[in-house]
């Protein structure tokens, strides 16, 4: 089934009816700005035989076949929008998505796979992508649909490393609190498609990557581990991440050996800037966390609130970020700084959670929970933390909301 677009915000205790409606409208505006179908429709249009992509024109008469590949939680919805534009011009396609994030398509196969930890289905689906891309020639056009979760969903370990090895290391990195940049530096050097290697495999075909960014600042080499962009990280960097989190001794030996061989120059590096693999590649970011945050601020101002975009570069432990945000809300309640009521503060970014024990949740639920005590007793105050892709960790929730009455 296709994932529901319904928005259900339940924790309204502590807010009067008017404020409830405002919170929901602001959240909906942010989500609409990140909507995958709408983003594709804004970026892709067909005029006769000319395909316009992010302002660049492609004459389809110059191509024999058009393929669609991709991976990510929003990539099925993106595929639907692409099919609506290109129809029967698509010769075939394959997209890996998270369980429950499927959609009805005709030319593009939608394949469910493991997320946030990859599973055997991720590998099977990635092999299908390789099969499509590998047969492409310089007369073919490949549309690559990338969105949040693409790193796990497009997983294909290098020879000699098993999925079990990869899963063990990924789990350790997640529990350690490693940043997405650090995790991607490791993944790129243990797999066959990440770090520009999909572009290298597709060359000399023309590649257009439509990208929904869930990463701070939207660096192309970080989003979904950058399958179509130059990789700035190295084997040495990947080894450094394992050392930083004391994982050398506990990581699977096959992984440590491979990274050490790469650091010694015995394994080819991922393609860097200037590599011929990128001569016919266009990377286009069609939606981002920053755009969602800006849309939220615009809606808040439209509703008559004093609104401020604090930052779209928020990082750190979710519980620590929660304390800072709660402190700012308390300052507004106490002194009207930095904004007088009625106020709306918006922040975007990517926090991390260091797992202690066996709890289930995600960074947004963790952040909201950590704000319960600091906000206790405040009237008409709410903190909403949500993932714009509709998924917060291994749960069916997008996030959570806390008010001044949640503790009671």
Identify the meaning behind each predicted range.
Residues 59-62, 71-102:
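Active-site cofactor/substrate anionic-group-binding motifs, chiefly glycine-
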Residues 159-172, 176-253, 257-258:
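Internal gly/pro-rich beta-alpha loop/helix module
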Residues 69-71, 94-97, 143-148, 174, ...:
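Short beta-strand segments
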Residues 81-90, 107-109, 157-168, 200-204, ...:
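A glycine- and small-aliphatic-rich helix-loop capping segment at beta-alpha/alpha-beta transitions
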Residues 187, 205-208, 230-324, 328-333:
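Accessory alpha-helical/coil subdomains and C-terminal extensions
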Residues 1-61, 77, 237, 246-271:
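N-terminal amphipathic/basic leader segments beginning at the initiator methionine
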Residues 310, 319-323, 334-335, 341-342, ...:
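Extended C-terminal subregions enriched in glycine
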Residues 96-138, 186-187:
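Glycine-rich oxoanion-binding loops at beta->alpha junctions
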């Amino acid at each position: 089934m296709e994932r529901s677009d319904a928005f259900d915000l339940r924790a309204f205790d502590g807010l009067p009816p008017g404020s409830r409606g405002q919170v929901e409208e602001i959240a909906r505006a942010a989500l609409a700005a990140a909507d995958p179908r709408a983003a594709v429709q804004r970026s892709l249009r067909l005029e006769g035989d000319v395909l316009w992509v992010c302002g660049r024109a492609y004459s389809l008469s110059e191509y024999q076949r058009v393929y669609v590949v991709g991976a990510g939680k929003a990539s099925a919805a993106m595929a639907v929008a692409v099919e609506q534009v290109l129809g029967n011009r698509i010769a075939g396609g394959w997209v890996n998505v998270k369980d429950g994030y499927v959609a009805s398509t005709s030319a593009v196969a939608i394949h469910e796979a493991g997320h946030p930890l990859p599973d055997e289905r991720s590998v099977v689906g990635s092999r299908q992508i390789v099969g499509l891309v590998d047969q492409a020639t310089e007369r073919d056009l490949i549309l690559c649909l990338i969105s949040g979760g693409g790193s796990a969903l497009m997983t294909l370990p290098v020879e000699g490393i098993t999925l079990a090895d990869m899963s063990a290391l990924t789990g350790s990195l997640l529990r350690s609190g490693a940043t997405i940049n650090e995790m991607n530096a490791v993944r790129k050097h243990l797999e066959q498609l990440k770090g520009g290697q999909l572009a290298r495999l597709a060359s000399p075909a023309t590649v257009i990557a439509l990208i929904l960014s869930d990463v701070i600042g939207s660096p192309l080499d970080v989003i979904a581990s950058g399958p179509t962009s130059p990789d700035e990280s190295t084997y040495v960097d990947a080894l450094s991440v394992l050392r930083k989190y004391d994982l050398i001794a506990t990581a699977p030996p096959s992984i440590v050996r491979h990274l050490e061989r790469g650091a010694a120059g015995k394994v080819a590096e991922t393609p860097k800037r200037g590599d011929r693999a990128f001569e016919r590649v266009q990377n286009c970011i069609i939606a981002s966390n920053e755009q969602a945050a800006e849309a939220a601020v615009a809606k808040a101002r439209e509703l008559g609130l004093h609104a401020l975009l604090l930052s779209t570069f928020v990082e750190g432990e979710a519980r620590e970020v929660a304390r800072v945000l709660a402190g700012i809300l308390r300052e507004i309640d106490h002194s009207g700084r930095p904004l007088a009521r009625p106020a709306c503060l918006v922040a975007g970014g990517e926090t991390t959670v260091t797992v202690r024990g066996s709890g289930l949740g995600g960074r947004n639920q963790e952040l909201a929970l950590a704000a319960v005590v600091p906000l206790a007793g405040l009237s008409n105050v709410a903190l909403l933390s949500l993932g714009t892709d509709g998924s917060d960790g291994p749960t069916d929730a997008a996030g959570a909301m806390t008010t001044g009455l949640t503790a009671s």
